[in-house]
């Protein structure tokens, strides 16, 4: 299993389904600026402030989150597609 460092979180994105009508992809279909994901691993240390104080992670393994589609490092680990993101790129915890 990947062990993220610092303020990083490992997530598994939900499969994106293309919108279709009668089997055809709709014209103008664009990617959303956010994506749903499940938290797979969280850094044990969390983020450090400018004064050196440790801020523990706000999310836990298994939570469903909404991620801003920006600085995402997608990796394949043990035949599984995962992504490493900064906790700051998580904009909401779902459910």
UniProtKB/Swiss-Prot annotation:
Keywords: Chaperone, Cytoplasm. The keyword Cytoplasm applies. GO terms for biological process: chaperone cofactor-dependent protein refolding. Signal peptide: none annotated. PROSITE patterns: CHAPERONINS_CPN10. GO terms for cellular component: cytoplasm. It holds the Pfam family Cpn10. InterPro entries: Chaperonin_GroES, Chaperonin_GroES_sf, Chaprnonin_Cpn10_CS, GroES-like_sf. It is found in: Cytoplasm. Its main location: cytoplasm. One of its GO terms (molecular function) is metal ion binding. CDD domains: cpn10. The keyword Chaperone applies. Belongs to the GroES chaperonin family. Together with the chaperonin GroEL, plays an essential role in assisting protein folding. The GroEL-GroES system forms a nano-cage that allows encapsulation of the non-native substrate proteins and provides a physical environment optimized to promote and accelerate protein folding. GroES binds to the apical surface of the GroEL ring, thereby capping the opening of the GroEL channel. Heptamer of 7 subunits arranged in a ring. Interacts with the chaperonin GroEL. This is Co-chaperonin GroES. It comes from Streptococcus uberis (strain ATCC BAA-854 / 0140J). The lineage of its organism: Bacteria, Bacillati, Bacillota, Bacilli, Lactobacillales. The gene is groES.
């Amino acid at each position: 299993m990947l062990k993220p460092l610092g303020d990083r979180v490992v997530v598994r994105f939900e499969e994106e389904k293309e919108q279709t009508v009668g089997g055809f992809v709709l014209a103008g279909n664009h990617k959303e600026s956010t994506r749903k994901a499940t938290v797979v691993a969280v850094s044990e240390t969390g983020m450090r402030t400018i004064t050196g104080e440790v801020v523990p992670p706000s999310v836990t393994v298994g939570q469903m989150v909404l991620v801003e589609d920006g600085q995402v490092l997608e990796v394949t680990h043990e035949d599984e597609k995962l992504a490493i993101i900064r906790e700051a790129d998580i904009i909401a915890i779902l459910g």
